[in-house]
C-alpha cells in the first residue's frame, strides 16, 4: 500500500500559485510604474535575493510540524505551517508596505493568521517589509475557495 503524503510538500507551490493568481493582478493595478511578472516577481528561491530584480516578493516556508497523528502514524493528517514573506523594492518604504498589505490580503483569503506584523528595513535605497503567516492545513483542505 502506497502512502500519499505528497500534499504536504506541495503547499508552498500552491501558495505561490495563489499569490501569482490573486496578488499580481492587484499589484499591477496599484503600481503601474513597477513590473510585476507571474513566475518571476514572487519566488521561493533564496538565490534570487542576491542581485535582486525589483520588486521581489520572497516566500519562505518555515519549519512546519505534524498535527493530528493517528495510531499507525503512516499518514500526515495535518501540519502547522508558517511562511515568511519579504517584499523588496528599490523605490520607497511605503511601496514595500503597500505591496505587503496586498500579499497579506491573499494570505488572509487563504485563512492564514498574521503572526508577525510587518517589520521594515532599509539600506542603500533597498527597502524591505517582512511578515509571517501561519495556519493549520489538513490533508483535504483547500487553501482557497474560489
Q: Could you tell me what each predicted segment is?
A:
Residues 1-21, 64-72, 76-80, 114-146:
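Short, charged interaction patches at domain edges and termini
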Residues 37-50, 89-98, 120:
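A broad, low-specificity signal for short, low-complexity segments enriched in glycine/proline
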Residues 56-96, 100, 113-116:
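Short, conserved turn/kink motifs that form compact alpha/beta structural patches or helix kinks used as
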Amino acid at each position: 500500500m502506497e502512502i500519499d503524503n505528497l500534499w504536504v510538500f506541495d503547499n508552498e507551490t500552491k501558495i505561490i500559485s495563489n499569490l501569482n493568481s490573486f496578488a499580481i493582478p492587484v499589484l499591477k493595478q496599484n503600481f503601474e510604474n513597477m513590473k510585476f511578472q507571474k513566475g518571476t516577481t514572487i519566488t521561493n528561491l533564496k538565490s534570487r535575493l542576491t542581485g535582486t530584480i525589483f520588486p521581489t516578493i520572497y516566500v519562505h516556508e518555515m519549519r512546519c510540524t505534524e498535527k493530528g497523528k493517528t495510531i499507525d502514524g503512516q499518514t500526515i493528517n495535518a501540519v502547522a505551517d508558517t511562511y515568511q514573506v519579504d517584499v523588496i523594492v528599490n523605490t520607497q518604504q511605503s511601496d514595500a508596505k503597500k505591496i505587503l498589505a496586498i500579499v497579506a490580503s491573499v494570505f488572509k483569503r487563504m485563512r492564514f493568521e498574521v503572526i508577525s506584523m510587518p517589520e521594515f528595513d532599509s539600506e542603500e535605497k533597498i527597502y524591505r517589509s517582512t511578515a509571517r503567516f501561519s495556519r493549520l492545513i489538513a490533508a483535504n483542505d483547500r487553501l482557497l475557495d474560489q
